[in-house]
Amino acid sequence: GGRIDVNIVTGGDEIEQRRFGDRVDHDRRYARTAEFLEVVTRLWDGETVDFAGEFYTIDGAFIPEPPQPRPTVFFGGSSDPALSVAADHAEVYLTWGEPPQVAGTKITEVARRAETRGRTLEYGVRLHVISRETSAEAWRVADRLLAGISDDEIAAAFALHSASGST
């Protein structure tokens, strides 16, 4: 990219979405994101856009001076609709720092889908990093952050994330 890149986030869990007036369900949010990316990337490419979709109707939209170079689209998600949006529209597919086999399976599937569309993506991993002068100091901070969190609380947090629709 150039001076700006964008990380597209389709949304979080259903309750969070409703707080902001968004009542579109998980899969339809990804359909809406696909439409948005179809329109915005065509605009960035300098096209005058006419578009009629389920969520957007655009008549003759254009950007007088499209960004140069075009912003790079970063996109992540683990659900089937997310993988399809990534394959169709992202330049960089992002995944969490999951076990290598889990991340590898997702990346392989996104790459396969992108290839069927004549596209090749780049890949990134999102991690939380604790940086200190020494490894021992970093581990002390990590241990302090994790102190007092039970295995049950960790399991509950994973279950909540899994049920959230943020995939």
Task: Show the residue positions of the predicted features.
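Hydrophobic faces of well-ordered beta-strands that scaffold small-molecule active sites
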Residues: I4-I8, V73-G76, E91-T95, L121-L127
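Short connector loops/turns at beta-strand edges and beta->alpha or beta->beta junctions
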Residues: G11-E14, S79-D80
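An alpha-helical appendage that flanks or caps ligand/catalytic pockets
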Residues: D13-E14, F20-P69, E98-T167
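Short, acidic/polar
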Residues: F75-V85
